[in-house]
Swiss-Prot record:
Residues recorded with modification N-acetylserine: S2
Similarity annotation: Belongs to the peptidase T1A family.
Key words of the record: Acetylation, Cytoplasm, Nucleus, Phosphoprotein, Proteasome
Gene3D superfamilies attached to this UniProt entry: Glutamine Phosphoribosylpyrophosphate, subunit 1, domain 1
The protein's name in its UniProt record: Proteasome subunit alpha type-3
Length: 255
């Protein structure tokens, strides 16, 4: 009975006999059904890429963004329920703002990730609330700490990463990320690879149209989190499409 959650999945405060909290697992399912987001840390910054699915031709271009500014030096990429993610982005902004007001300098990313992770975890403890149905990555760059990247999942666990992927194609994306020499690459190099990975893992059969969202924070932006300029994004998309075309042609030749 416990293996399918019968009777034990009604509340986030209830454990099943085999030690599982089904509401948290269901929240993770919401993330797994979402479009893919990846973050890669390199020697001079962090680059985020998001496959934002376009569910209707009537949507205005650029709406429902999945990349957020949390602070001047911190960016956030999300997968899962967008409304939940926006709520957590506001919480993260409040934490960053309060820290600067109290201490007079930018919040360290490790501290911010831990604070928001504790907030997310609190929503897995009580029957009156439900877990957040999203995972998100936080990235920053500073002269003292260098590039940093953290991921927080619906259970409230926070991990530091060199490369991370969340969403429906996370396994395929992680496989591609592992092929990269991230510690030797710059943000300019990584932007192209991020675009390429998003195009590789995109499922053209199930999900026809998508918008590629790219942002970065690093030396190239003087430590500020910014959306990648249009010309750089278009160059990255062109590189991604050409790489895919070359791979398809080589596969055809091998056959």
């Amino acid at each position: 009975m416990s293996s399918i959650g019968t009777g034990y999945d009604l509340s986030a405060s209830t454990f099943s006999p085999d030690g599982r909290v089904f509401q948290v697992e269901y929240a993770m399912k919401a993330v797994e059904n979402s479009s893919t987001a990846i973050g890669i840390r390199c020697k001079d910054g962090v680059v985020f890429g998001v496959e934002k699915l376009v569910l209707s031709k009537l949507y205005e271009e650029g709406s429902n963004k999945r990349l957020f500014n949390v602070d001047r030096h911190v960016g956030m990429a999300v997968a899962g329920l967008l409304a939940d993610a926006r709520s957590l982005a506001d919480i993260a902004r409040e934490e960053a703002s309060n820290f600067r007001s109290n201490f007079g300098y930018n919040i360290p990313l490790k501290h911010l990730a831990d604070r928001v992770a504790m907030y997310v975890h609190a929503y897995t403890l009580y029957s009156a609330v439900r877990p957040f149905g999203c995972s998100f990555m936080l990235g920053s760059y500073s002269v003292n700490d260098g590039a940093q990247l953290y991921m927080i999942d619906p259970s409230g666990v926070s991990y530091g990463y060199w490369g991370c992927a969340i969403g429906k194609a996370r396994q395929a994306a992680k496989t591609e990320i592992e092929k990269l020499q991230m510690k030797e690459m710059t943000c300019r190099d990584v932007v192209k690879e991020v675009a390429k990975i998003i195009y590789i893992v995109h499922d053209e059969v199930k999900d026809k149209a998508f918008e590629l969202e790219l942002s970065w924070v690093g030396e190239i932006t003087n430590g500020r989190h910014e959306i990648v300029p249009k010309d750089v994004r278009e160059e990255a998309e062109k590189y991604a499409k050409e790489s895919l075309k070359e791979e398809d042609e080589s596969d055809d030749d091998n056959m």
